[in-house]
């Protein structure tokens, strides 16, 4: 039996959805343990694209999929996503999909607060997706949140929600001069969601405990990336949850002894959406090439991603923060055609060489990358299915990543399709 955590090692958008979809074939259950619909997975199965924001990617494999207590859930987005999947023949039914009773609910006022706050920051915006994730986590920590278990008692839910909407209306009007929300309309809308989702609400921790007792395999699906972690990321240009592997336990209701390994997803180059320092960012034709060839637009926001060379400094730190046991390198095919590749092996800061990722964004923003040149390749690798069939230069690139990060490469993605993958070591084997 193996229980594997999949996490992003950069700033998100590493291709976790494809890898989770691939590994779901070997798992019995797939669990989301943090974040919300501010993250999106794009999957290509049999030439058909699926974009998922909340429902775990394993749903396409017919697996039991769970949303853990660490996720904040917008019921409007969730019900819409469930309906969209069903319309395409995917079985999203209570027997195959559950939401933790302890998961917090994103309310309409969370989204409004998110947007008006960001607008008020002017040039100091942090690049929020405006989906209410941060304000929902604030209410969770402030003990003012509503959870899915509250939806199971509709009279009490109506009362709690009405009280919260009125309180948040005062905040919106007095702090930002924003228009108040319609209390009755908002409550009626969410009561509708409660009635729809009631059959899907469950004790996810109990389900996972039973699965463990039965020797079933579990795949834990992280969202965003290591450097968007609220504690370990490039604060304040981060998300509102812990994205590192340790949160798989807290966010799903299991103990650390239940985990077998952690697979870190690494894009073969580096990308970032929104604001924040990015030492290896490219502003030349190579950066444009990566953006264009890699179709680097956010699945959730549609925003153009910033592109740059692979940063081994941040990857080595990510390996430590997550306890990585393996790497999955994605979008290796995008680098085809470049004569020379660069890997950042250290930073230069005020005349000193830094080998560790700094916690201070001001320091990071002033860091200059120290590059090591690696030979590129010209061969089309999109049809490669064995590591031995990769060009010598591509294999050397992967080997160098392993040497710099100290973690072996288990999987290599050479295209968007599920079958466009080289599996060197299966984490579930």
From Swiss-Prot:
Cofactor: Mg(2+)
PROSITE patterns: ADENYLOSUCCIN_SYN_1, ADENYLOSUCCIN_SYN_2
The protein's enzyme class: ligase
Record localization: Cytoplasm
Catalytic machinery residues: 13 (proton acceptor), 41 (proton donor)
EC number: 6.3.4.4
UniProt binding sites for substrate: 299-305
Cross-referenced InterPro entries: Adenylosuccin_syn_GTP-bd, Adenylosuccin_syn_Lys_AS, Adenylosuccinate_synth_dom1, Adenylosuccinate_synth_dom2, Adenylosuccinate_synth_dom3, Adenylosuccinate_synthetase, P-loop_NTPase
GO biological-process terms attached to the record: 'de novo' AMP biosynthetic process; IMP metabolic process
Coiled-coil portions: none
Residues that, per the record, bind IMP: 13-16, 38-41, 129, 143, 224, 239, 303
Co-factor remark: Binds 1 Mg(2+) ion per subunit.
UniProt xrefs under Pfam families: Adenylsucc_synt (PF00709)
Domain of life: Bacteria
Keywords: Cytoplasm, GTP-binding, Ligase, Magnesium, Metal-binding, Nucleotide-binding, Purine biosynthesis
Function: Plays an important role in the de novo pathway of purine nucleotide biosynthesis. Catalyzes the first committed step in the biosynthesis of AMP from IMP.
NCBIfam families found in the cross-reference section: PRK01117.1 (NF002223), purA (TIGR00184)
Stated family: Belongs to the adenylosuccinate synthetase family.
Record-linked HAMAP family: Adenylosucc_synth (MF_00011)
Subunit description: Homodimer.
Protein name in the entry: Adenylosuccinate synthetase
Organism: Desulfosudis oleivorans (strain DSM 6200 / JCM 39069 / Hxd3) (Desulfococcus oleovorans)
Encoding gene, per UniProt annotation: purA
């Amino acid at each position: 039996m193996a229980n594997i955590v999949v996490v992003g090692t950069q700033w998100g958008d590493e291709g976790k959805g494809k890898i989770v979809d691939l590994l779901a074939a070997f798992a019995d259950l797939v669990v989301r343990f943090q974040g919300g619909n501010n993250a999106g997975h794009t999957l290509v199965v049999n030439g058909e694209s699926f974009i998922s924001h909340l429902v775990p990617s394993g749903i396409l494999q017919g697996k039991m999929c769970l949303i853990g207590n660490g996720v904040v859930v917008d019921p409007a987005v969730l019900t819409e996503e469930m309906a969209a999947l069903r319309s395409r023949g995917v079985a999203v039914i209570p027997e195959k999909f559950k939401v933790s009773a302890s998961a917090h609910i994103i309310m309409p006022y969370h989204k409004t607060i998110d947007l008006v706050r960001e607008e008020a920051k002017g040039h100091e915006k942090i690049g929020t997706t405006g989906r209410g994730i941060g304000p929902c986590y604030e209410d969770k920590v402030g003990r003012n949140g509503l959870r899915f278990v509250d939806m199971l008692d509709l009279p009490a839910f109506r009362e709690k929600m009405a009280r919260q909407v009125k309180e948040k209306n005062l905040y919106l009007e007095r702090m930002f001069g924003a228009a108040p929300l319609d209390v009755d309309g908002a409550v009626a809308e969410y009561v509708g969601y409660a009635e729809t989702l009631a059959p899907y609400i469950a004790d996810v921790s109990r389900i996972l405990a039973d699965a463990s007792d039965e020797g079933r395999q579990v795949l834990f699906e992280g969202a965003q990336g290591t450097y968007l972690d609220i504690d370990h990321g490039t604060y304040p240009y981060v998300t509102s949850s812990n994205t590192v592997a340790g949160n798989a336990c807290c966010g799903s209701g299991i103990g650390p002894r239940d985990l077998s390994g952690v697979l870190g997803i690494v894009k073969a180059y580096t990308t970032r959406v929104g604001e924040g320092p990015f030492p290896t960012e490219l502003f030349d034709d190579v950066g444009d090439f990566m953006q264009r060839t890699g179709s680097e637009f956010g699945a959730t926001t549609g925003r153009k991603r910033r592109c740059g060379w692979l940063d081994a400094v941040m990857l080595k730190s990510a390996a430590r923060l997550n306890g990585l046991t393996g790497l999955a390198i994605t979008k290796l095919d995008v680098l085809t055609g470049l004569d020379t590749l660069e890997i950042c092996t250290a930073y230069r800061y005020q005349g000193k060489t830094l080998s560790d990722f700094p916690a201070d964004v001001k320091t990071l923003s002033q860091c200059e990358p120290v590059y090591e040149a690696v030979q590129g390749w010209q061969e089309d690798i999109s049809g490669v299915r064995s590591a031995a069939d990769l060009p010598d230069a591509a294999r050397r690139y992967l080997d160098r990543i392993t040497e710099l990060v100290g973690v072996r490469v288990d999987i290599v993605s050479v295209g968007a399709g599920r079958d466009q993958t080289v599996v060197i070591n299966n984490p579930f084997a």
